[in-house]
């Protein structure tokens, strides 16, 4: 709501259309973002957790639950029957379940003191109305102010190289780098804990490697610019090792590749790729037996 309020002068037409449709179909009021923002700030702080829990207990009853079970239809696959699932649900009522305790760390993203760099040179860019900054670490930065959005800063960094600089025998491992690198989180925060630490902030950073480039990108609200820079620093310097998260990633990848191998179109696609690229090692699709 805060973001929509800050961007109220740049509201897209589609947002207005959705408002009108919901008003016509559901009789939903259209007070305007200014009123909604004021109401949220007045009402939300006065809603205790106990009140939310009480409403949830009223919403979830024995007669309005639906269980969905999904899985591949193949020989050897065994799934519980409708009766067995119903028995499990009934049995759950006798379990001694304790309320979930959410542990949120007050630790800062970066605990040590970091020596900042300097701007070595600054001059007007040659095109697009940019300002060119050269930093003491060798990075060249182009700054471009726009009026596209009033409450957003967008960042993108590129360096050249990518997977092309690695030998062919390493390409299978490198192909999973984007998925594996940050699976354990960054700094002292797991992926889950990082999300909790960023609650209330609007900042995100991602990094990736392509065939010929390495990239880092991010966006944030102006008030959270420092947080975005901290996330960028940790992404480069402190990917977090988490063996449990890594094993979970491998298991998910194996299941995904196993299901892909069961699809006849996968074999067809692999054949076309092999013919087009002459069985080149960089064009080989990863298989389940390659994961370990």
Residue ranges and their predicted role:
Residues 18, 22-160, 164-167:
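Proteolytic maturation boundary segments
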Residues 1-46, 64-72, 142-144, 149-182, ...:
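M16 family metallopeptidases and their MPP-like homologs
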């Amino acid at each position: 709501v805060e973001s929509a309020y800050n961007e109220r002068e740049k509201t897209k037409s589609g947002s207005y259309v959705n408002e009108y449709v919901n008003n016509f179909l559901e009789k939903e009021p259209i007070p305007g973002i200014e009123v909604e923002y004021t109401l949220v700030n007045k009402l939300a702080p006065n809603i205790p957790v106990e009140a939310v829990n009480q409403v949830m207990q009223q919403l979830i009853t024995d007669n309005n639950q639906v269980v969905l079970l999904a899985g591949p239809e193949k020989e050897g696959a065994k799934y519980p029957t409708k009766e067995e699932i119903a028995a499990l649900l009934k049995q759950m009522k006798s379990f001694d379940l304790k309320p979930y305790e959410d542990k949120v760390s007050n630790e800062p993203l970066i605990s040590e003191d970091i020596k900042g760099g300097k701007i070595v040179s600054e001059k007007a860019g040659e095109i697009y109305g940019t300002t060119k900054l050269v930093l003491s670490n060798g990075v060249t930065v182009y700054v471009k102010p726009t009026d596209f959005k009033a409450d957003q800063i967008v960042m993108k960094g590129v360096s050249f190289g990518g997977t092309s600089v690695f030998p062919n025998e390493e390409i299978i491992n490198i192909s999973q780098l984007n998925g594996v690198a940050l699976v354990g989180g960054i700094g002292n925060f797991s992926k889950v804990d990082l999300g909790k630490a960023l609650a209330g902030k609007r900042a995100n950073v991602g990094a990736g490697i392509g065939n010929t480039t390495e990239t880092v990108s991010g966006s944030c609200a102006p008030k959270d610019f420092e947080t975005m820079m901290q996330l960028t620093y940790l992404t480069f310097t402190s990917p977090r090792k988490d063996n449990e998260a890594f094993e979970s990633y491998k298991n998910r990848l194996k299941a995904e590749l196993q299901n892909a191998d069961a699809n006849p179109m996968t074999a067809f696609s692999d054949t076309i790729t092999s013919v087009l690229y002459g069985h080149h090692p960089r064009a080989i699709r990863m298989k389940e037996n390659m994961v370990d």
